[in-house]
Amino acid sequence: MVYWFDSHPIYYWIIAWISFGLLGCAALLPVAVGLFSEKIEQRMLHFLPRWLFMALAALCLFAFRWPTWYVPKEFNPDESEFLAEALTLQHRPVFWGAVDGESHGPLDVFPLCLLRGVGLKYDFFGERLFGAILMLALIFGCYRALAAYARESVARAAVLPIMCMLVFCSFWDFVSYSSEDVPIASLAIGFWLLVSDLARPLARRRWSARWIAGGLLLGAVPMAKLQGGPASAALLVTCAVCDLCHGGIELRIRVHRTLVLAASSLATTVFIVLLTWAFGALRHAWLSYVIQNLNYTQAANSPLYMIQHFWEFVQQAVELSPYLVGVAIVAALSLMIALMAPASNVRLAVLALVFLAASLGVAIAPGRFYPHYLLFLIAPAGVLAGALWVAGWQSAERAPQAPWVRAALLLLLLGALVCPQIVARATHPHPYLGQLRSIESLANDPVTIEIRRYGHPGESLGMWGWMCRYYAYTGMWQATRKAHTYKQITPSPQIDYYRYRYMQDLQRNRPPVFVDAVGPGNFLYNDRAVAHESFPALRDYIATHYRQMADINGCRIYVRLDRLAQP
């Protein structure tokens, strides 16, 4: 059926746009009717409950995104690396002991280990489906954060631009499973939990599961991607300060709540650190996850350079630049009305501004123009525009012609943030629709076929170079802690440490097949001057224990001698 839809794109578009039409009706009809009759608005919300609204959001997201799930090649080399790490953790579930993410942590990878438990394979389909579910969680977090400070119907309209951005997006680095997916979903849900707790009546704030859960989620972000840590820290500190400065609760209770938030935010990190220490991998975690990431940011473009070239950075992601322009327009025009709102109505906008500023810093801090870093901006930018729009909506209640002012605000939201995204999606072809059969042939890679002659799924695979796709294609786990050898090839103060660790892992796991993926046509490494022979200890080990069996597409395939001796 998938191939039938792919070969008949018109039916794909019909179903996708019908699903969006249903979502648009659920988002906009109640607020539009509410301009003139709150009674009818409430009746409509009764027939369009919250769960149905989110179900329509899921239907719409999946209806537009499914062609990307079936593309049997990596959109980003990181996708194959995540699959390789998940396969390895099934064999030995010790992060930094069996797997080293370097720029990402265990919470980015361990959730992928659940794919097999729900009947999915370790492949690009399951990985991207999980990524889409995380985007749905992000949408839910933004929606409920807005609903904590606005009427249900108004919150639905305010979150629609974020939905459009994630539903219509087909940019390769945004629809792939990336190391940002878990952090941005956690940030959005954690943001909702904390700001919704701050919106609760004072009498109900003493004990709150939301406050603790929000701290746990935001505190877990650095264990998914260390880069996201400053954004989670900024939100935790800002929410704690807002709570401490509120004079309506006893100081003792406010201090207690701050301590509870601090403890919950540290709990996940402390737990993972203790586990890592217990398995003897704490030194590796410190060197690779902390020191390496600090060195990574220092050996790149300066923050000033990134700010000066920020718009060029944004324009790499084709759908993001019009979204951010729309956010700026809605935020600026809504602000003029929102300034007349009560302070409580503007609080969400202030918190969202902190969220956006911290996320902007997170996106540019590494000093590299990698588009997937920009994923950090989608939720906070949309929530800031939505929060100011909501505050303007609430301020308009005092206007002599309140329905007409609100109608103008609704038209502003649609004209600046919703309709441009609809037009862009409707007028641009889907890059992966109608091509599945031709793309599928890419998975029948001759290197993969040759590896499978000697190795089998569930066995380890040795690799020199950066062609992690062969782990994903063969179902074999990585024999060394890292799926590629960037750190073993690139000169750095830590190269001896990484090479020593590489040899330890290779000798311990003794992979039946070793692939030297340095050669013409390979990712990043084409010059065989940096092939495995450039590392004398590895050269001697391979020469002693392996025999070269093929040289295909720039990859030399070696097989362990005792495997060749088997009948």
Language-model-derived ranges and their functions:
Residues G24-I40, E319-V346, L353, A357-A358:
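Hydrophobic, aromatic-rich transmembrane alpha-helices
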Residues S103, G229-A233, V237, A426-H430, ...:
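Short periplasmic/luminal acceptor-recognition loop of GT-C membrane glycosyltransferases, typified by
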Residues P106, F110, V118-F140:
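Loop-to-helix entry region of an early transmembrane alpha helix in multi-pass inner-membrane enzymes
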Residues C142-V167, I184-A185, L202-R205, V350:
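Transmembrane-helix signature of polytopic, membrane-embedded enzymes
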Residues A150-S153, A188-A213, L244-I249, Y323-R347, ...:
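Membrane-interface transmembrane helices that cradle and orient dolichyl/undecaprenyl
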Residues W207-L226, S232-V237, A267, L356-A365:
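Membrane-interface alpha helices of multi-pass inner-membrane proteins
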Residues P230, L360-V362, P366-W404:
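Hydrophobic/aromatic-rich transmembrane helices and adjacent perimembrane loops
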Residues A231-L266, M336-A343, V383, W389-A399:
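Perimembrane helix-loop-helix junctions
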